[in-house]
UniProtKB/Swiss-Prot annotation:
It comes from Escherichia coli (strain K12). Induction: Under conditions of iron deficiency and by the fur protein. It is found in: Cytoplasm. Changing D244A: Efficiently phosphopantetheinylated by EntD. Residues 209-284 form the Carrier domain. Its EC number is 6.3.2.14, 3.3.2.1. Proteins EntB, EntD, EntE, and EntF form a multienzyme complex called enterobactin synthase. Homodimer. Also forms a specific pairwise interaction with EntC; this interaction likely facilitates substrate channeling to connect the EntB and EntC active sites. This is Enterobactin synthase component B. GO terms for cellular component: cytosol; plasma membrane. Involved in the biosynthesis of the siderophore enterobactin (enterochelin), which is a macrocyclic trimeric lactone of N-(2,3-dihydroxybenzoyl)-serine. The serine trilactone serves as a scaffolding for the three catechol functionalities that provide hexadentate coordination for the tightly ligated iron(3+) atoms. EntB is a bifunctional protein that serves as an isochorismate lyase and an aryl carrier protein (ArCP). Catalyzes the conversion of isochorismate to 2,3-dihydro-2,3-dihydroxybenzoate (2,3-diDHB), the precursor of 2,3-dihydroxybenzoate (DHB). It comes from the Bacteria. Changing G242A: Not efficiently phosphopantetheinylated by EntD.
Amino acid sequence: MAIPKLQAYALPESHDIPQNKVDWAFEPQRAALLIHDMQDYFVSFWGENCPMMEQVIANIAALRDYCKQHNIPVYYTAQPKEQSDEDRALLNDMWGPGLTRSPEQQKVVDRLTPDADDTVLVKWRYSAFHRSPLEQMLKESGRNQLIITGVYAHIGCMTTATDAFMRDIKPFMVADALADFSRDEHLMSLKYVAGRSGRVVMTEELLPAPIPASKAALREVILPLLDESDEPFDDDNLIDYGLDSVRMMALAARWRKVHGDIDFVMLAKNPTIDAWWKLLSREVK
């Protein structure tokens, strides 16, 4: 009845993306980001320090950072810690008391904590649209594309994508920014959405050109990722200015598309703008 303990698996890669029936172009000025149910409770079923979930969180963080930089609204769904039997209704039959048994795990995972200008929607059923103002908020802001990330791919994420489609909102399911009970169920959800209700993409498809054109451009990429109000010098340690490991992993994933040897360890070894520009400005081989 309850969610079982979950095992990590290989996240989908570009060659795993099913044939999309639609070829919708991603339009940032028409899009919104949904971070679906990334609460401690739902993520905890993979255990602590799960590399797969670290990558999923890093990919979501990269998308969120991009959205913040481009004035794309960010929405979260989160189940409440208190849910009456009337509110849960048939969910009790299918999943038992769920999160209500572990109210201390209700918050969104630390590395994706919502900002004050984000919208957190109370989640009551599989679809993020059920008993929520999401459709109205999207349409009032002129948004008709929804980037879907989070857990679980074949339950709430797939249902939300299909519900969005039926409301004339174009869903973009981000294959490597989702997680599921198993790889088979993850891939099933992608196949369904690609063929029935949306477009399936990889994180990298929604992000801009991966390599900054200059050291100044690199600085513009880095500054929004820092917690400190003071700007670092080019040789300052960026970790001292609040750059965390999740954002560093996301940067490594983006830059590795051009320089295949770049990884988290390489960036963390010398986390300065000078050192990173030296890595990025190398001739591509």
